């Protein structure tokens, strides 16, 4: 494992229980923060390395977290290293292309799966787009489940099911590792004993009575082949996602196992964003 990875110590994360006693809106940005956020959204400060440093500066100007709205959804940001929260705070178009790809063509009762859901960047907009469907939001980090539970409640969203599990090709227990001390870059370590439960995607979906998926997003820091490939190759045809957004390991290249499975099942690469690839199932060909 790369030397920038280390064991995730959950005890070092901020105690969110005390802040969650305050309803959403209690921690709205102050006047100075609002001005700085507006400047950031309109300048280069919303990009790359500028964004993380500028976001940290903004959040340091008040005590406690920040409550913001993104795509009509409520998010409480925790001033803890989390690149997703930096994007939510400063970039009004953050991951919009990726989210819109999944939503386009969905019905009011379409189901979605979000593997590596973090604070709900994808899960919440997907749930709003299909209010009569279900969103299965899976994250191995128990803190992310708590934070997404708070966010969805604040957004008055009732069709998200949050699941605190890691996804792999088998079931067991492991630990979590973190890269660059960023809570958004966390992966499962199956070889180190710990309290993190992992299971297969097919088992998770069966437990939650999901028999059809319109869109699936997966971002689990290198575990994509183990989590997704066995599911795709063994799931009934009806359960195959119509659309998939998957994190790229490097520019213009996808995980080898997933690429083979996509080809076998007639998924077409239809686009790429900065961080992800977009695949659509060709339903007109035999699978």
Language-model segments: what does each one mean?
Residues 166-169, 200:
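Conserved acidic residues
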Residues 240-248:
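Conserved beta-strand signature within the Rossmann-like core of class I S-adenosyl-L-methionine
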Residues 161-163, 270:
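General small-molecule cofactor/ligand-binding pocket signal
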Residues 90-113, 157, 161, 173-175, ...:
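Short internal loop-to-helix segment that lines adenine-nucleotide cofactor pockets
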Residues 126-130, 233-241:
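Short, conserved loop/helix-junction motifs that constitute active-site signature segments
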Residues 1-141, 146-151, 155, 206-208, ...:
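S-adenosyl-L-methionine
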Residues 141-147, 224, 248-252:
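Canonical radical SAM enzyme core domain
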Residues 113-115, 138, 165, 216-218, ...:
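Active-site flanking residues adjacent to catalytic metal/cofactor-binding acidic residues
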């Amino acid at each position: 494992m790369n030397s920038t990875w280390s064991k995730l110590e959950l005890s070092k994360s901020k105690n969110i229980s005390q802040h969650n006693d305050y309803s959403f809106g209690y921690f709205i940005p102050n006047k100075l923060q609002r001005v700085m956020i507006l400047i950031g959204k309109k300048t280069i400060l919303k990009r790359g390395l500028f964004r993380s440093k500028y976001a940290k500066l903004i959040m340091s100007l008040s005590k406690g977290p920040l409550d913001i709205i993104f795509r009509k959804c409520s998010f409480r940001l925790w001033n803890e290293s989390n690149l997703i929260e930096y994007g939510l705070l400063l970039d009004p178009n953050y991951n919009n292309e990726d989210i819109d790809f999944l939503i386009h063509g969905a019905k009011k009762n379409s189901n979605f799966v979000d593997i590596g859901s973090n604070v709900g960047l994808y899960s919440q907009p997907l749930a709003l787009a299909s209010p009569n469907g279900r969103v299965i939001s899976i994250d191995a980090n128990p803190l992310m489940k708590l934070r997404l539970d708070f966010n969805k409640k604040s957004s008055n969203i009732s069709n998200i099911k949050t699941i605190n599990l890691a996804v792999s090709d088998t079931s067991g227990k492991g630990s979590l590792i973190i890269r660059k001390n960023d809570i958004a870059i966390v992966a499962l370590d199956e070889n180190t004993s710990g309290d993190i439960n992992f299971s297969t995607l097919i088992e998770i979906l069966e437990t939650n009575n999901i028999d059809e998926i319109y869109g699936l997003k997966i971002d689990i820091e290198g575990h994509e082949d183990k989590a997704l490939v066995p599911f795709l190759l063994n799931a009934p045809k009806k359960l195959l996602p119509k659309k998939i957004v998957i994190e790229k390991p490097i520019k213009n290249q996808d995980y080898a196992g997933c690429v083979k499975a996509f080809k076998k099942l007639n998924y077409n690469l239809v686009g790429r964003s900065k961080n992800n690839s977009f695949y659509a199932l060709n339903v007109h060909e035999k699978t």
